[in-house]
Each structure stands twice: as structure tokens, then as C-alpha cells.
């Protein structure tokens, strides 16, 4: 304990010098012990209320089994509107300038009634309420700061590591009457003042926050004159694509060894090293991060070499699994061990949206994000330049594959556009468009086809979705540079445990990447322990496409190829072989690509109560509050 305190008190440069005195294979373990996550060891029962810091205050949060920011957003807004309706207080919902919060406007005449209501309404039992001052709008410089009631139900996981609280509060603001108009106390995205007595209507929740997906079928009451669609709202579907491999699968290893016996050119040491294919369940948590922090995604496509993760329910409507045999059907349908080759075919996925995010399984969303973090509302994509460079000169067999591909990209950009590129892209989700990838394939057909045919990384490859697409799109006015809060950590580096500890404590990054390109196999066990500790703490709530733990434990006894084979057999029979252990598989060609599946969205609550221990969620119940003065429904715009 004394050594731990001394180490943590030392300046970082001194820590690094001490660590470098250790043998290389021991550094990661020692640093992890000295700087790993502190606290959080107590596991609280579901339904318990535990003290947590939240929004600058200390409050008590309910321990729940699963929750997402979108579900909590709905929970808070539903409870407030239910309480107001039960008390007969007129209101309207409107878009908050903070996309993670909701707003409800009430006439100032009802301020005293609302003040009493928040202390007594059954719908708000257990809610945290605070009154804050907000600044008036720019066109009201003479106005005094206004009071806003923030109302939320704090929730946390069993370790109290994640708090879903004040950040997602519903804010009640008080509008003042001036003759025949009502005036907002602060800025909002639509209107500063409006006529008295506007027609009440119910609208899709998507009109109230850009975080809410178009497919969300919750409806809330507002004024007809507030039912406008903002020009900066993304209205087109966005999908996500992953490539994944389980390098420990015996049958996959046989396929890899057979392919290594017939190489298609000089093979760089990194091109087939073990760490490139090592599976630590990162995909499970990366997909969790999408479910939690990007509910606006339409569907997730998972490309595998006829493998299935043991934890994935491939029958879930949000997930479509695509095999290499399908992706490379016109090239013989063989397994590929080359990420550049697989990436060169992404635009050929049946049913994929024009706009999509491509992620490696070591990339995670770190907090709630909007579609506009990746695409402008007019469809233009964003890309995120890295300060790292891939060097000058032509690609050589001795170049690391990523550098060789960057040099090949540069050669084509020079020929097509007359400019020279030198920078890599950050390891973030890549915002891509199918039409641009098709254009690249048509223009550079020979090189794209050659890349797709290389079964291992080759110095002649192109890296299309991670570099070439971005520059090509930029130089054809279809993409622009963007900004993103980002963290990159090499799993084998001694500084990584301390950086993960900071990520857990601050949760201050939009995206983080936990990369492992060329680690010593002797450190794999330590890295696995580090991730097994970090990822469940950062993303503790399972997604709906994950199977129950007891089912996963049984499925882990089989290899990833065996799981695929069982599920594929179930798919051909039109039934499950041994449900729920072997769920029927939804694969690319068998999935109905014309159907747009609604994502699993917010809590379907019969307010005012919340089932203890879990937020109810799914498509089976609707927002059921009754409007005392019902108006017509408006469809999403």
C-alpha cells in the first residue's frame, strides 16, 4: 500500500523511467497493478439506491440491470408529462439546445402549482429535482435569468460506475404571457415567442432531439407551430459495419495455415502475426457502445469468415451477419485474412445504406453522439486526420502494410487530383458512402480487384475505407475534415492502464481505440485481464442482441465456425436447432434487405412507476399518457 501511494505521487516522467527499468514482459502487469481502477469493487443488488456523484451534486441512484441514455431520456420526459397531465396543467414539449435533455414549457401562471407537483406527484416519486438559473436569449438582453426545474431519475449499474442522471434531465421552463403572445424564458431552436392558444398536437419524439432515431414511435404533446424539421437534422439512414475474426477457432486456424502455404506474394511479418487475429471480446463491447451511444443507427452488419461470436444472437433484427463466401462470391468465395481485401468489398453488402460507419472491433464510442458527428445533414461525410504519417516514396515489400497501402493511396490521389497526401486517419469510426466506394472501384478497377484477391496483407494493397475514400471524397466535394475527441491506446504499452483508469473516471472522449497490432504473445493474458476489467466497467449494460450469460457459457464450448455451421443449418431449416443455444442465423443473402428494422428504443413505461432493477424497453408498449386536451397526431417529418 505504501509503494502504491509513493508511485501515484510521483510525476509521470519519473514513473516512466522506473517502469523502463523492468523487463519488457513485466511492465504492463506492474503498471496495471499500480495504476488500475480504484474502488468499484462492491456489487449492489438490483433495485438498491446507492450514493453517487451526479451533475455536481451527491444523490442516490437506483441500481438497474440495463439502461441506455435514450431510455433514460424517455423515462424522465414521460414522468414529467404524466405528472402535468394528471394535474391538469397545460404544457408543450420542445427541443432543448442540449440534445441529451428534454424541455417542457409551462405558463408562468402555473409555477407555484408545478413547484408543489414535483414534491407530490406519484409519477415523480423517486425523482431528483433541482432549480437552476438559465440565461435569457440573445434578443432579450434586458431580461433577468430565469428559473428552470431539472427533473431526473438517477440510475446506475451494479458497481455504481456508470451514472445516468442529470445529463439526461427533463427541464421544465416557464413561459410568460404578454397580451396575445407567450414568450420563452431562454433560447430554443425554433421560436422565442408564439401566439397564445396554439393547437396542441402529438409528434414523434425525433422532433424533440436529434439523438432520438426517426424510427422511435414515442409521441409527445407540443404546439403545432413547433412541429418543424430542423435543416441540420440527419434524415437519411445510417448503418454500421464491422469485420471480425476469432483467431482461436481451430477450424479457422486450419484455413489460415492452408492459405499461408500458398502465399500470393512477399509477406510482411505483421501481415499474419497472431495479435492481428486475437479475440478478446472487444466486438461485444464495441457493439454495446453503438447500442448505448448511437441509437440512431439503423442496422449493424457483421462480416466474418463463416464464424459467429458466442455471445451474439444473430436473429436479432438489428444484426445481419455476412460471410466471406458471400462477400467474395465473384472471386471464388474463399476466406480472406487481409483486412484491406475485406474492406475493399464493403460497398457490395446487400441492403447496406448509402451512408454507413465502418468500425474495427477495437474502436468504441465513449459517450452519446449525434449522426452529425460523422455526417452533415446534407449527406457530406466527415473524416478525422491523424498527425501520423506514412512516409514518402513508393510502397516496398519491407514497408509495414498500413504504410504501404497509404503510399499506394497517395499514388492514385496524385494521378487523379494532382495533390500529394501524407497523413493517416485516426482510428475512429469511418464515415463512408457506398457511391464513393463504387466510384473508386470503377476508376481503379485493377488495383481494387488485386487488393480483394490478396488473402493476406500485401504491399500492393489499397486501404480504401480507412484512407483512400476520405481523400477521394474530399477532393470531389463529398467530405470535409471534422473534429472528434479521441483517445488511442496501444494495449501493449505500459502507459495504457493509467490511461484506461482516466477514461473510466472522466468518460471524456467521443471515441477511443484499444489497438494491438504487434504485441508480444507473452503479454496476451495480461492484456486480456486488463480489458476484462475495463470494458465491463465502462459499458456494463448488455445490448438486446447479446445472449444470456448461461447460454454464452454453453456456446463457448464450441468453436466460432461450429456456431456458424449450427446457426446456418437452423436458417436453412427455417427453425432453431436447439433454441436458445443455437439461434437461427440471419445472413446477408437471407436477410430481407428491404425491411428497415426499428432499433430497440426507449422505455415503454406505464407511468408513473418504474419496474425495480430494470428499465422496461422494446417495441411492445407505447407512450400511454392521455392528453387532457387531445389534438391530432402528426407523423415524423
Place the predicted regions along the sequence by residue:
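Active-site-proximal specificity loops/subdomain of glycosyltransferases
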Residues: 308-352
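Long, low-complexity C-terminal extensions of enzymes
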Residues: 85-87, 110-158, 464-466, 470-575
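Long, charge-rich alpha-helical interaction segments
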Residues: 375, 381-456, 460
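N-terminal anchoring/stem segment of glycosyltransferases
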Residues: 31-110, 206-326, 477, 514-520, ...
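Boundary detector for helix-to-coil junctions that initiate low-complexity/charged tails
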Residues: 1-31, 362
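Long, charge-dense tracts
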Residues: 59, 67, 71-223, 227-232
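GT-A fold catalytic core of metal-dependent nucleotide-sugar glycosyltransferases
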Residues: 308, 313, 345-390
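Compositionally biased, low-complexity flexible segments
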Residues: 576-594, 599-636
Amino acid at each position: 500500500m505504501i509503494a502504491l501511494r509513493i508511485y501515484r505521487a510521483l510525476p509521470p516522467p519519473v514513473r516512466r523511467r522506473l517502469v523502463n527499468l523492468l523487463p519488457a514482459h513485466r511492465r504492463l502487469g506492474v503498471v496495471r497493478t499500480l495504476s488500475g481502477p480504484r474502488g468499484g469493487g462492491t456489487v449492489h443488488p438490483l433495485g438498491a439506491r446507492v450514493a453517487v456523484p451526479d451533475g455536481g451534486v451527491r444523490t442516490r441512484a437506483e441500481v438497474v440491470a440495463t439502461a441506455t441514455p435514450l431510455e433514460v431520456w424517455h423515462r424522465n420526459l414521460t414522468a414529467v408529462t404524466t405528472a402535468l397531465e394528471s394535474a391538469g396543467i397545460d404544457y408543450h414539449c420542445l427541443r432543448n439546445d442540449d440534445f441529451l435533455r428534454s424541455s417542457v414549457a409551462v405558463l408562468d401562471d402555473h409555477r407555484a402549482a408545478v413547484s408543489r407537483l414535483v414534491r407530490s406527484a406519484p409519477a415523480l416519486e423517486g425523482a431528483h429535482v433541482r432549480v437552476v438559473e438559465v440565461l435569457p436569449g440573445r434578443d432579450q438582453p434586458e431580461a433577468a435569468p430565469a428559473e428552470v426545474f431539472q427533473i431526473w431519475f438517477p440510475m446506475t449499474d451494479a458497481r455504481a460506475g456508470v451514472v445516468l442522471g442529470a445529463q439526461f434531465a427533463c427541464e421544465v421552463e416557464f413561459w410568460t404571457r404578454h397580451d396575445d403572445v407567450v414568450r420563452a424564458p431562454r433560447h430554443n431552436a425554433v421560436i422565442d415567442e408564439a401566439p397564445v392558444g396554439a393547437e396542441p398536437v402529438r409528434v414523434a419524439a425525433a422532433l424533440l432531439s436529434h439523438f432520438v432515431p426517426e424510427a422511435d414511435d414515442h409521441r409527445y404533446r407540443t404546439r403545432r407551430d413547433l412541429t418543424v424539421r430542423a435543416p441540420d437534422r440527419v434524415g437519411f439512414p445510417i448503418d454500421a459495419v464491422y469485420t471480425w475474426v476469432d483467431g482461436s477457432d481451430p477450424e479457422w486456424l486450419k484455413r489460415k495455415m492452408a492459405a499461408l502455404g500458398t502465399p500470393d506474394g512477399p509477406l510482411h511479418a505483421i501481415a499474419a502475426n497472431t495479435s492481428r487475429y486475437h479475440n478478446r471480446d472487444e466486438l461485444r463491447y464495441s457493439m454495446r457502445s453503438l447500442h448505448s451511444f448511437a441509437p440512431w443507427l439503423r442496422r449493424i452488419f457483421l462480416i466474418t469468415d463463416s464464424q459467429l461470436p458466442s455471445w451474439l444472437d444473430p436473429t436479432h433484427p438489428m444484426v445481419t451477419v455476412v460471410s466471406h463466401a458471400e462477400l467474395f462470391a465473384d472471386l471464388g468465395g474463399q476466406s480472406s485474412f487481409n483486412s484491406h481485401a475485406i474492406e475493399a468489398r464493403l460497398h457490395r453488402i446487400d441492403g447496406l445504406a448509402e451512408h454507413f460507419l465502418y468500425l474495427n472491433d477495437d474502436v468504441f464510442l465513449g459517450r452519446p453522439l449525434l449522426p452529425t458527428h460523422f455526417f452533415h445533414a446534407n449527406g457530406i461525410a466527415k473524416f478525422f486526420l491523424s498527425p501520423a504519417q506514412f512516409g514518402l516514396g513508393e510502397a516496398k515489400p519491407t514497408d509495414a502494410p498500413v504504410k504501404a497501402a497509404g503510399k499506394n493511396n497517395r499514388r492514385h490521389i496524385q494521378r487523379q487530383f494532382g495533390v500529394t497526401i501524407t497523413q493517416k486517419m485516426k482510428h475512429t469510426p469511418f464515415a463512408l458512402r457506398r457511391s464513393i466506394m463504387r466510384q473508386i472501384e470503377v476508376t481503379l478497377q485493377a488495383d481494387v480487384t488485386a487488393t480483394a484477391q490478396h488473402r493476406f496483407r500485401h504491399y500492393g494493397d489499397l486501404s480504401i475505407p480507412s484512407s483512400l475514400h476520405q481523400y477521394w471524397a474530399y477532393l470531389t466535394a463529398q467530405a470535409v475534415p471534422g473534429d472528434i475527441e479521441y483517445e488511442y491506446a496501444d494495449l501493449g504499452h505500459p502507459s495504457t492502464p493509467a490511461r484506461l483508469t482516466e477514461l473510466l473516471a472522466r468518460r471524456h472522449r467521443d471515441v477511443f481505440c484499444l489497438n494491438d497490432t504487434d504485441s508480444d504473445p507473452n503479454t496476451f493474458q495480461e492484456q486480456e485481464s486488463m480489458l476484462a476489467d475495463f470494458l465491463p466497467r465502462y459499458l456494463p449494460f448488455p445490448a438486446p442482441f447479446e445472449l444470456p450469460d448461461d447460454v454464452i457459457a454453453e456456446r463457448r464450448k464450441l468453436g466460432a465456425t461450429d456456431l456458424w455451421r449450427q446457426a446456418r443449418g437452423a436458417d436453412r431449416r427455417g427453425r432453431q436447432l436447439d433454441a436458445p443455444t443455437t439461434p437461427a442465423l440471419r445472413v446477408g443473402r437471407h436477410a430481407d434487405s428491404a425491411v428497415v428494422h426499428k432499433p430497440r428504443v426507449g422505455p415503454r413505461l406505464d407511468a408513473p412507476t418504474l419496474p425495480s432493477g430494470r428499465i422496461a424497453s422494446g417495441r411492445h408498449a407505447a407512450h400511454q399518457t392521455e392528453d387532457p386536451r387531445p389534438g391530432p397526431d402528426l407523423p415524423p417529418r
